[in-house]
Amino acid sequence: MSVDRESLRETAKYLQNVRPVDPEEVYEYLPSQPHPAVVRRALREEAFSLGFREREDGSFVPISEDPVDQPGWEPTQYPPQYDRAVADRLVERYGRDWETGESGHRLRERIRELKETYYRGEQASYDEEAALAYAIYHGADFYAATGYALDPLTERGLLPRRLRVLDVGAGTGSPAVALHDYLPEDAVVDYHAVEPSANADVLEAVLAETGRNFRTTIHRTTAEAFDPGSVG
């Protein structure tokens, strides 16, 4: 059953000034009274444009207009949930002891090849094995560096709680999840990754660990073929 989006938006805009927007209530005001679960899905899709965030109880409230405060970014490791997402793909391809034996040797060799390619300023190409090697080599340092790059924005009050991000050449996702973890829980992000290589498979697994208000879309195409206007 579909939802009349115009009626949904009008109802949500009215209720936001009164109380949290609850799909269990909103459906009663809509034509054909669609199931609350359908209304919730539609609200999630409309949340960014409405300026809403979803709470743990499934209701929606306006996003604060206050800029993001400095979170005191000092990571000591790549968070376990993202590390596991990469490790699961390694186990799927090579088995539980992926870091030893022939598979471990091949991964280390691919890392050395990637480093040599970077050093020469050449363009790297990524098949599945290279993507996994890339994730192993760059995961932690790219994660940490991204947060430090955001600090100057928060120092100046320039990082809003509602963000639309276009990440061209998104790689295996460390910068994306660093942004997710850097932001407060009441932030809302519409994140679009442009990644044509096998890195996108690792990226998809890592992004699956992000929260409900970090909406993600992966565009598996080249930067040249991608239309930035398509993301709104």
Predicted features along the sequence, with ranges:
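Conserved SAM-binding motif I beta-strand of class I
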Residues: A187-P196
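N-terminal auxiliary segments of SAM/dcSAM-dependent transferases
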Residues: E24-S32, V38-G121
